[in-house]
């Protein structure tokens, strides 16, 4: 699985900033936060949107702050601490303080399937993440997608796992000039169908390839 894009970090950050509202809008809807693109733009710009719940407005602002965090902090490690920090940013005021930036201690149910994720154990999470990162034979794009899917299936937090997964993966993508993982609105039903299958089987091959084929954004640079 080759890198689709070979950008500098500066170029990749430019791509992200240029399309940031679109990425936030799609990410929010992927997590079931029903907002329109214009509403997302207004919230991002600090405006007021009538008719939206407070939680939806908070969720959009949290995604804004989390994106700023990954774009402005090149030197942060791809580790458990960063996972927890991203969760703090994305879920601030949306989960109880005792759950913010901490792995869950209660069971969770997954919509659309009877499958249930196992309880996360901090030492196992750290070991599994390190193993995924240290795959020298794979490209950064493939590693980022695998880590994103692992976070989603692991369900280590009480809420917001897909948001955390995409942000953490995109931190890896951006730092290595590989583009941006973003799932379009029209592709989200297919994504969820494949995600449920992945949850139930643990086999990421089909979903990983589909994300690679359909859901990586970037720019082609001219050689001139």
Task: Give the residues covered by each predicted segment.
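FIC/Doc superfamily catalytic core
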Residues: 1-224
């Amino acid at each position: 699985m080759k890198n689709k894009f070979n950008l500098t970090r500066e170029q990749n950050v430019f791509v992200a900033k240029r399309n940031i509202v679109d990425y936030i809008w799609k990410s929010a809807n992927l997590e079931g936060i029903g907002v329109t693109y214009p509403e997302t733009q207004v919230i991002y710009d600090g405006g007021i949107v009538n008719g939206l719940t407070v939680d939806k407005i908070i969720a959009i602002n949290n995604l804004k702050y989390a994106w700023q965090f990954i774009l402005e902090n090149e030197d942060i490690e791809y580790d458990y601490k960063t996972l927890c920090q991203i969760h703090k940013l994305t879920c601030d005021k949306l989960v109880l303080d005792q759950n913010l930036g901490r792995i869950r201690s209660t069971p969770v149910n997954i919509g659309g399937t009877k499958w249930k994720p196992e309880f996360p154990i901090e030492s196992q999470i750290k070991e599994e993440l390190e193993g995924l990162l240290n795959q020298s034979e794979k490209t950064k794009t493939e590693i980022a997608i695998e880590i994103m899917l692992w976070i989603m299936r692991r369900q280590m937090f009480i809420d917001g796992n897909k948001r955390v997964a995409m942000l953490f993966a995109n931190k890896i993508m951006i730092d290595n000039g590989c583009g941006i993982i973003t799932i379009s609105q029209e592709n989200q039903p297919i994504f969820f169908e494949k995600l449920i299958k992945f949850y139930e089987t643990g086999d990421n091959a089909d979903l990983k390839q589909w994300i690679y084929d359909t859901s990586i954004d970037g720019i082609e640079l001219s050689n001139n």
